[in-house]
Amino acid sequence: MSAAARGLVRLVKSYQRHLSPRKPAPTCRFTPTCSQYAVEAIERHGALKGAWLAAWRVLRCNPLVPGGCDPVPEHFPSWRGPHPKTPSRKTPE
């Protein structure tokens, strides 16, 4: 793991130890919690991609999203090109 990734993991774990217990009630809508998701994402995908996944997860942790089980993906998703469910726009030859 890179130095940047180790630093980010330490930062999240510090949040888990010192700030999270002071909240009046659990506030995360997902399992694993957003902070645990961040640690796993950074450990699995590195500092940059892991932080991106963690930020996207925190943005989704709101009352408009139902929540539930949302594990860290095994492989970093590729958003280049069309979505797999989008029909191709190629013209017939």
From Swiss-Prot:
Signal peptide: none
Membrane recorded as keyword: yes
Pfam families, alphabetized: YidD
Ranges of Basic residues composition bias in the record: 82-93
Region (Disordered): 72-93
Record's GO cellular component terms: plasma membrane
Keywords: Cell membrane, Membrane
Major place of residence: membrane
Entry annotated with the keyword Protein biosynthesis: no
Domain of life the protein comes from: Bacteria
Protein's cellular compartments: Cell membrane
Membrane-related topology note: Peripheral membrane protein
Family according to the record: Belongs to the UPF0161 family.
PANTHER family (alphabetical): MEMBRANE PROTEIN INSERTION EFFICIENCY FACTOR-RELATED
General function of this protein: Could be involved in insertion of integral membrane proteins into the membrane.
Protein name as annotated: Putative membrane protein insertion efficiency factor
Organism: Deinococcus geothermalis (strain DSM 11300 / CIP 105573 / AG-3a)
